[in-house]
Amino acid sequence: GLVRLALGRGRFFEAPFVEFDAYVDRVIQQSGVFYRLIFVHRYTQKSFHKTAFSTIESSKSEVLALWDVLQTYMDVTQPLPDVPRLEPFRHLDPVTAEHDLRSGRNPRFWRDLDLEAWKQGEGKEWLKRQMEYPWDKRQCRLTPQLGKISMAEYRKLRPADAWPI
């Protein structure tokens, strides 16, 4: 699918999702080291670090999990990621609707969830699995370098006339 990112002043940059490489950027602040996802268009070297998906996170695994969710979301052969934000739309996607029917997924799972109980039980387990997941061993289908090169190293490799990061 296509990605459309705002450049400001009513201008947009649009390109196929597969043309974007994702990088984890370390953000050093007074309160500690944080992480965010940066998108770089492979052919123009334009970088985007102020998107809805570039929030600063305290955990690198949270950023890597977000990239995994985005790849799943953009892959039309897979069901939509099972996240609260997408639940109201799952029935509109044929692949997801079929998957949910086969798996017996409650169409209101997230909306009817007792959040506090979930945080103490299953949610706590999900977070633990995400934190312990061997992200560095996983081969990213779209961006094989994710997590293998730092943003500082990437900046050094960029052409001098590339879009500034």
Locations of regions flagged by a protein language model:
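Alpha-helical transmembrane spans
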Residues: 2, 116-165
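Eukaryotic phosphoinositide-binding membrane-targeting regions
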Residues: 96-125, 129
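Short, solvent-exposed coil/turn linker segments
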Residues: 13-18, 52-54, 114
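Generic preference for hydrophobic/aromatic residues in regular secondary structure cores
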Residues: 20-24, 35-37, 95, 99, ...
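Phosphoinositide-dependent membrane-docking surfaces
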Residues: 3, 9-29
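A membrane-cytosol interface segment of integral membrane proteins
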Residues: 31-96
